């Protein structure tokens, strides 16, 4: 077993070194803006001023939603102040960071987005309002987080909407003489999937032609709703294709240009309650969630748990992830080491960059984000 584990470690190291070796071969794409992004949710305890822009190039304001009658973005009076503060903060920070606002999110009305994408007048009203909001509040771009188109028709409608969106952005830039707005989308960890609906695939050609990049949500892969523990954002999974690398490769094999892909990483872990505290590896039987809302624990909370409970911390070679356990509580998560592995693979695959979900969950000194930024700088 020791030899097998050592071999796996060596394979991981070899692939990271491959990323470093690609420096010369990627020089032709050096003009492309690399992405070190993070999503920010409205949080009085974590205002925009607390974000360290030396670690990030792009900050995503989350979330705005369209009105279900006018189909235009609905901006509340409180959001007006929040949006103004957000963009002004990141334009005046040193270094400054680009800002985008994100539309939708996990709790949004997927059916409304589906209707907007399918109805040309509604789609035009929606798109024009997004450009107006971006220019009014000084954003550099727009991000769509539609979770998720439910069938092939909705995917096709998404592709057409992206085409119309890009055209409107290009026309606005040509008319005003301003640099065109960025247009991005947050997408499922794999290019094709069947959860939350019928089997379907993202509109690859439209993504390549109309989006600056997609933020691939390479997390929420395992959770306490399952009856066994697992890596919430495992880099690998030898028993299935539910892993970060598998998902990214599905996008690349589908024809999406690697430099259109930005890998997502979570700043949180997921907790389980073990059925038997003496059985505590990956795949151990469980009986629901542990601490946190639905088992979600911020990275800083995981560290507090480890310290207060004198938890045992293990690195799992098969998934390149970390887990802690104490008593019946089991937590799967990423730490600076596993994030370095992921960044190495992102570079080996020649991705555009990475992003984190979500600001406020790292430690106060940004342990995870700092290590990711350092790892990326290696090339």
From Swiss-Prot:
Q: Which residues cross the membrane?
A: none
Enumerate the CDD domains for this protein.
GH18_plant_chitinase_class_V
Q: Which GO terms describe its cellular component?
A: extracellular region
> According to its UniProt record, in which pathway does this protein act?
Glycan degradation; chitin degradation
Q: Matching Pfam families, A to Z?
A: Glyco_hydro_18 (PF00704)
Q: What is the effect of changing residue 296 to G?
A: No effect on chitinase activity
As its record notes, the protein acts as a catalyst of: Random endo-hydrolysis of N-acetyl-beta-D-glucosaminide (1->4)-beta-linkages in chitin and chitodextrins
**InterPro entries reported in the protein's UniProt record:** Chitinase_II/V-like_cat, Chitinase_insertion_sf, Glyco_hydro18_cat, Glyco_hydro_18_chit_AS, Glycoside_hydrolase_SF, Glycosyl_Hydrlase_18
> What is the protein's given name?
Class V chitinase CHIT5b
Organism of provenance: Medicago truncatula (Barrel medic)
């Amino acid at each position: 077993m020791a030899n097998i584990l050592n071999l796996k470690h060596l394979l991981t190291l070899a692939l990271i070194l491959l990323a470093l070796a690609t420096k010369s071969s990627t020089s032709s794409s050096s003009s492309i803006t690399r992405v070190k992004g993070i999503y920010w949710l409205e949080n009085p305890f974590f205002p925009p001023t607390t974000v360290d822009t030396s670690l990030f190039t792009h900050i995503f304001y989350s979330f705005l939603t369209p009105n279900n009658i006018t189909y235009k973005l609905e901006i509340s009076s409180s959001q007006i102040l929040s949006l103004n503060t957000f963009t002004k903060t990141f334009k005046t920070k040193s270094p400054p960071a680009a800002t985008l606002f994100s539309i939708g999110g996990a709790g949004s009305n997927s059916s409304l987005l589906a209707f907007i994408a399918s109805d040309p007048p509604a789609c035009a009203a929606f798109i024009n309002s997004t450009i107006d909001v971006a220019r009014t509040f000084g954003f550099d771009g727009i991000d769509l987080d539609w979770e998720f188109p439910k069938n092939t028709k909705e995917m096709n409608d998404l592709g057409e909407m992206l085409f119309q969106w890009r055209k409107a952005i290009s026309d606005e830039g040509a008319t005003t003489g301003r640099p065109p707005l960025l247009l991005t989308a947050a997408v499922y960890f794999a290019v094709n999937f069947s959860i939350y609906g019928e089997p379907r695939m993202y509109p690859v050609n439209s993504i390549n032609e109309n989006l600056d990049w997609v933020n691939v949500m390479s997390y929420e892969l395992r959770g306490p709703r399952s009856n066994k523990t697992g890596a919430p954002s495992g880099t690998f999974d030898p028993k299935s294709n539910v892993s970060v690398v598998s998902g990214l490769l599905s996008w690349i094999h589908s024809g999406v240009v690697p430099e259109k892909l930005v890998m997502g990483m979570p700043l949180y872990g997921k907790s389980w309650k073990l059925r038997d505290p003496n059985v505590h590896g990956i795949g151990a039987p469980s009986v629901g969630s542990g601490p946190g809302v639905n088992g979600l624990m911020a990275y800083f909370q995981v560290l507090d748990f480890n310290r207060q409970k004198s938890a045992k911390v293990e690195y799992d070679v098969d998934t390149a992830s970390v887990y802690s356990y104490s008593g019946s509580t089991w937590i799967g998560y990423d730490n600076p080491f596993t994030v370095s592995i992921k960044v190495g693979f992102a570079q080996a695959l020649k991705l555009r960059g990475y992003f984190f979900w979500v600001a406020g969950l790292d430690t106060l000194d940004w342990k995870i984000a700092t290590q990711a930024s350092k790892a990326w700088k290696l090339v």
